[in-house]
């Protein structure tokens, strides 16, 4: 009854108005699984490749009809009749069918849409929520949210170099409390910006995108907002950064245009260390460029015992690259973006590989999202303990938070919220 009898893909639009792929997988029992894939703005060079049409006459070349066609023909034919309960076998079938090594032939967007839709169909067939189907009985830990309240870099049209400034509710006793805390700080921050005549328009991920005197001004505003909302910076609400340093790394220097600085790796590590001494920063993502492995080693040696150092562009959710990073003492955490690797099985393997190495894993959205809430379930299923899925505005972001509220309600008294325990790699 769990045999796949039909696979249908279509072109839909993401939160930036760009095309993306949505797939339906129908089982013999009549059960349907549906999944839509996201798309990133700052993209690691070793990510799995999403397939775009490159037809300038349509969506400025960003159409995905080729990927849709690949699902409706080759992929559909390859998995028709297979058992949806065998996720690993189906994902391996998709990887082998593509044959390219980086999913560039069929498209990671095509492959991932089917991989996730299969899992959702199988969960429905079993009468289980997705988090329980994927994770089993041991999935009871809610993730600590990393909420993007100020956007910059490639995610906003402003003068801030750093891509994300996030708030992290550590002192809450439940996910519901953490979400309320984040919302209160978010609205307090909006009031501060408005009072000072700054823009309160939001960026791709729902955070505010004001022009500021320099990068540090964002940290000052966030600390003030935390305090004005009635919380303690640090114990109640910590701060995280996504530098997205690859975006401003050129010719061996980190170019911080809002500060008028061009820093080498040592100087940029010093720059970040100064912030850590002044502000309650517990996490830094992509603190060095993906092309600056020596800089990453320096940063990890300098800060890795006191701050979570998350590798996004450098690891691209790839367990093999993570293994290389672990062996060289690079970072202490990995960001998990499903479309960076292209199948559910590979993403879950990357999470497990990180845990075995003593690294944390942060399940993440992309800047171009849809209403699909799969990553909320995956964060709980994998006991990843952390999730990064945007700010407290834009329904494409809130959809994930609301799904986590439902999951916590479903878990009842068995649900746990780890707070600072989510950062178990820190001394």
Curated annotation (Swiss-Prot):
Predominant location: cytoplasm
Record text on cofactor binding: Binds a second Mg(2+) ion via substrate during catalysis.
Subcellular location: Cytoplasm; Secreted; Cell surface
Domain of life: Bacteria
Active site (UniProt): 205, 337
Cofactor(s) needed for function: Mg(2+)
HAMAP family named in the record: Enolase
Name this protein carries in UniProt: Enolase
Organism, as annotated: Nitrosospira multiformis (strain ATCC 25196 / NCIMB 11849 / C 71)
